[in-house]
């Protein structure tokens, strides 16, 4: 008995080391870039506005990104925040797993998630965004919900309400986990609907989310315009291809975890067969929470077509490890089996880390190696030659303008998508008095965006974009020339 206890303690130490290694490795990979990913840049910009909404999402992720970046103006702090959320999510997955699995299997249900690209490659490439926040809050919601319906502690109901409220304040997709929880409760815990703490929890969540509801009303439900713009009006075939592509990408995202689990099964002659003595309510808890969000996304694909993003489903794989070990259990997980799967996870980590690091180092892409100082210096000189006002506003393609807003000395304000109604924080009169610089890679778009950003321009206003070229160099000194355009709309009375 003491030997078994010692083995579990040893495995726990290895598990903690694994979490620390994951935190360190994936917090540093992004430093190969010269600028943060666009999602993180958007977050910093939105967070700096201190508002209760954005043109795309509720505000929480933006606030967090801005707070992480603000003290030291450091990209590393944003990458570190991302991995702190992921490791936090791992901890709550482990805590939830212990209700379904033994101690060793619970740790392994987290460890094999290293093979799920949502926890490594994707966060390393896209940085901190609302999806990363979900990687923490969804396991937290699931854990506290399970606690609430089984143990009915007031503290857990209070925490559940707070977490759900902030989860909705981060992304509306939180509903895709809340919805199956209601279904499960209806069939297996009807008495919960008579519990006063259930309603207190709902009220707490609503109160936390309510400032955003007020913001939505004040701003004519701006994020839903973004969603409407994502709907695909192209050929009908896309509406069938998109769900199929979604499924293929979901398999690709989870293939690393599936391989770690499957190879261990084969190596140790553990058959792929369902376990015995399942509790019906636990089976449906995992199936509903684990699969309903993905099914809903498939249905969404039928409506959205080609504009559906496969990565919208990545954050819902947090139950993958638990489901694998629960439905296809090992008869007994020995120390050798534990170490084999742990080593496999490290091998996957190294492979993915080197692959992503190489990609980010080799690519000559403005998304990862944007020469902010050079472009800002050149545009500032061009602005000074034409205008006697400060270079205060910049519009155009956000992947060109946001790096300048975040990193440049004077932080010119980005006009998102160059639509005034999508930028409620901008004072049109002040913009008119100071002028705007429009920046884009496509000449024809400059004309369209100029009129969108400045609705006060007369219809016959002549717009003649100026060509501009710059060199972008990767980590190995190889360069690429980008040809873009800009146009300065001078101050007007």
Model-inferred region functions:
Residues 12-16, 93-116, 135-136:
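Transmembrane-helix signature of polytopic, membrane-embedded enzymes
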Residues 123-133:
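Short acidic/glycine- and proline-prone juxtamembrane loop motifs at membrane-interface regions
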Residues 166, 177-282, 293, 298, ...:
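Transmembrane-lumen/periplasm boundary regions of multi-pass, lipid-linked membrane glycan transferases
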Residues 99-104, 141-156:
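Membrane-interface transmembrane helices that cradle and orient dolichyl/undecaprenyl
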Residues 424-493:
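Aromatic/acidic, Gly/Pro-rich catalytic loop(s) in extracytoplasmic/lumenal soluble domains
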Residues 76, 80-101, 140-141:
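Transmembrane-helix motifs of polytopic, lipid-linked glycan transferases
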